[in-house]
Structures are given as C-alpha cells and as structure tokens.
Amino acid sequence: MLTFMASDSEEEVCDERTSLMSAESPTPRSCQDGRQGLEDGESAAQWRSQESEEDHEEEDPDRYVCSGVPGRPPGLEEELTLKYGAKHVIMLFVPVTLCMIVVVATIKSVRFYTEKNGQLIYTPFSEDTPSVGQRLLNSVLNTLIMISVIVTMTIFLVVLYKYRCYKFIHGWLIMSSLMLLFLFTYIYLGEVLKTYNVAMDYPTLFLTVWNFGAVGMVCIHWKGPLVLQQAYLIMISALMALVFIKYLPEWSAWVILGAISVYDLVAVLCPKGPLRMLVETAQERNEPIFPALIYSSAMVWTVGMAKLDPSSQGALQLPYDPEMEEDSYDSFGEPSYPDVFEPPLPGYPGEELEEEEERGVKLGLGDFIFYSVLVGKAAATGSGDWNTTLACFVAILIGLCLTLLLLAVFKKALPALPISITFGLIFYFSTDNLVRPFMDTLASHQLYI
C-alpha cells in the first residue's frame, strides 16, 4: 500500500517548511506589525517602498504555507506534484533497492536460504511429485490457504484498530518485532558467520544480537533517528523475505505472488477493503499508522512545547532562519519578512502541538517483503542467472515508478504491489524462457552481440 504522508484535510498545514514559532525565536513581521509601525511614526514612504518591493518580488512557492489560501499562484499544484513526485521516487527507490540487494546478496552467498528442508505451516501441500497437474493443484491449494491467512489477519487487525484496541495491537507488533530482531537475526548472523568461516564466541554473539535488537525495538516502537528507524525496517523486511524464500515451495511462491497482488488491489481500492478501511479510519482520527507496519520516507510527526504570545495566537508563520536574516534587509536598512497568513488555528500558551514536518510517502512493509521475495526467488530458483535477477529488479523499480506517478495524479492511497509484481512476473518468465536460452546459445557458439 502506497500513500502520501500529507495532511488529512485541505485546511491543515501541508508545506514541508512550515512550523510554529516558539517564543525564543524572533517573531516574523505581520501586517498588524506594519500598521503599528505606521502609528508609531514609521515613514509611510518607507512602508510603501517596502510593499512595492514585495509586490514585484518573484513568487516563491515555498512562501505559501497552506493549500487553498488566497494568493497561491496558478500552476503551483502542478509544480509541487512534479517536485515531490521526483523526490519521492528517489526516496523510495533507495530503500527498496537496499532491501532487494540484501536479499540477493544473501541468496547468492549463504546456501542455508536456498536449501529446501522444510515448509511453512501455511503451505502444507508438498510439490515433490512428478505429476505436473498434481504439483499445480498443490500450489493453488497452498496459495488459497496463505491468502486466507493474510486476509483473516488483516481483517482482525482492522477490527482491533476500529475498536481502539491499541494495547493489543502494540503487543502483537512488539512480539513480532522481538522475534524478527532477535531470533531471526541470530539465525541469519550464525549462517553468515558459518558461510564465511568467521569464528565468534557465544557471549559476543549474544551481546551483538542483544544490542542490535534492543536498539531496533527502541527506534521502531518508541523514539530514534529517522534514518536508523528506516534501516531497521529495511532489515526486518529482508529477514522476513528470506524466510519466505527458504520455506515457500517454488511453484507456490509464484502463484502466491500473483494472488497477493490481486488481493492488494481489492483490499486498497474496494470501498469495504480492509486496508482502505484502515487508512480511512486513521485519517478520520488524525492518527499515524503504526510505524512497525509502514515505511515512512519522512518524519511523520514532531511534538514540541510552543509558548505562544496571546496577541499572536492563531498566526501560522514560517520558521526562523539565521541565513535569511542576513539577506532580508531592504534598501532603508529595515528587515523585510516573508508573508504571514492567519488561518483559524486556535492555540494556547504551553500547549503541546503536533505538526507535520515534511511531506513524504508511506510504503507498507509487506510491499518491501514481496518485492524482495520475487527478486530472491528469481536468484534462487531455476537457472538463477544474473540476467533474470536484474530483469526482475528493473521491472519492480519501473512498476514502483508508475505507481508513484499514479499516486501523484490521484492523490489517494494506492496498492503498490499489482504493477510491480505483474511486471516482475512477466520479466521473470520471459527472461528465463526466452532471453536466457538465447544468450546460452550465443555463448555456446561463441557469438557476441
């Protein structure tokens, strides 16, 4: 699921440079300050000259702090769409690429994740049968069971969220994070050390896993640097993808990838889809979705104590910038200030205020997992050559780019799996069955193009 991390209503603050000034920062000059200056004897000619300079000044989109306010230049929405669209592509390409690189590098180097010595409890039907029809039937049955479990767990989560069972959800997510950050990390680190023949004593290993897991729990479920939180979310997505790659049967994995993309389409776009209901409920309550479920490309909320002057309550102002102060003096030696708009935003001294710091996009961790499963399966199964792996990698990035383009156009939550997974499956089977035999034939005849 892919969605903008913007304000829930058009009247709310939505610019990335907007913040509420504290009492310690110099207060920007408003229109009321200007009128008071005239009453105190300030030169009217100076004020008119200052207004004339501001009127002829080139319009800067960053000076407009709220959508829908008077004075927004025409075409600003299109400029913001292009600006944030390109920015969001880069902000999501990097984590998705890193997650897939971790998975592919592990698959190519650690043999443990390519050995088939067990199956998940959700895929009980074995594919070790010579009959193609029986193998296909077993893969379809495994897919039905897997999708049923996913649908049931999603609906259960939505019901818990709708009835405000936050403690139960937090406990559920904390238990999942504990298992991923401690147990799966211990298994992963042990296999990597075994593969590269690196000796490590158990106390050091336990201390390393403990530090890694403890910091991850704090960053994901409490507070921590955004970059560190993003790194942990990428890592747990890669660990979960590796588990699926190891324990999902080959045919079942491909059928599940196709089915999960269809389910994602239905769950997000249908009026009564569970993921759509989850997003709409969070928007109605003006609450962020749990960080353990969502990768955010920017900081979601900042909380601070703002000491507001009673005379300026409700004024929405731009942040104080020391560099702007040096260049903000007009020809008469008086500082000129950016425009100040005053939407009806009540405030009280000492009130704890929440503000949106930066616009961004959110991508569900499930999308990271299934992107990596597709690329990892391409690297682990069949020929496992690099042409097929790179083709799937490029296909997923192309699909993600198209999804972000649609997100900028429709400006609502969209499923992130269908386009990317469809392209990935097409590229995988076409490359594995057409391009790879062609390249092998050229290589066997020593022909180079």
Curated annotation (Swiss-Prot):
Cytoplasmic side stretches: 1-88, 161-167, 223-224, 272-362, 411-414, 436-449
Main location: endoplasmic reticulum
GO cellular-component term (any): centrosome
GO BP field: amyloid-beta formation; calcium ion homeostasis; intracellular signal transduction; membrane protein ectodomain proteolysis; mitochondrion-endoplasmic reticulum membrane tethering; Notch signaling pathway; protein processing; regulation of calcium import into the mitochondrion
GO molecular function terms attached to this record: aspartic endopeptidase activity, intramembrane cleaving
Topology in the lipid bilayer: Multi-pass membrane protein
Phosphoserine found at: S22, S25, S30, S52
Location relative to the cell: Endoplasmic reticulum membrane; Golgi apparatus membrane
Motif PAL mapped to chain: 415-417
Entry keywords, A to Z: Endoplasmic reticulum, Golgi apparatus, Hydrolase, Membrane, Notch signaling pathway, Phosphoprotein, Protease, Transmembrane, Transmembrane helix
Active site residues of this protein: D264, D367
The enzyme's E.C. designation: 3.4.23.-
InterPro entries per the UniProt record, alphabetical: Pept_A22A_PS2, Peptidase_A22A, Preselin/SPP, Presenilin_C
Superkingdom as given in the UniProt entry: Eukaryota
TM annotation in the entry: 89-109, 140-160, 168-188, 202-222, 225-245, 251-271, 363-383, 390-410
Positions on the Lumenal side per record topology: 110-139, 189-201, 246-250, 384-389
Broadest EC class assigned to this enzyme: hydrolase
Intramembrane stretches (start-end): 415-435
Bias kind Acidic residues: ranges: 52-61
Post-translational modification: Phosphorylated on serine residues.
Subunit structure: Homodimer. Component of the gamma-secretase complex, a complex composed of a presenilin homodimer (PSEN1 or PSEN2), nicastrin (NCSTN), APH1 (APH1A or APH1B) and PEN2. Such minimal complex is sufficient for secretase activity, although other components may exist. Interacts with DOCK3. Interacts with HERPUD1, FLNA and FLNB.
Protein function: Probable catalytic subunit of the gamma-secretase complex, an endoprotease complex that catalyzes the intramembrane cleavage of integral membrane proteins such as Notch receptors and APP (amyloid-beta precursor protein). Requires the other members of the gamma-secretase complex to have a protease activity. May play a role in intracellular signaling and gene expression or in linking chromatin to the nuclear membrane. May function in the cytoplasmic partitioning of proteins.
Family: Belongs to the peptidase A22A family.
Name of this protein: Presenilin-2
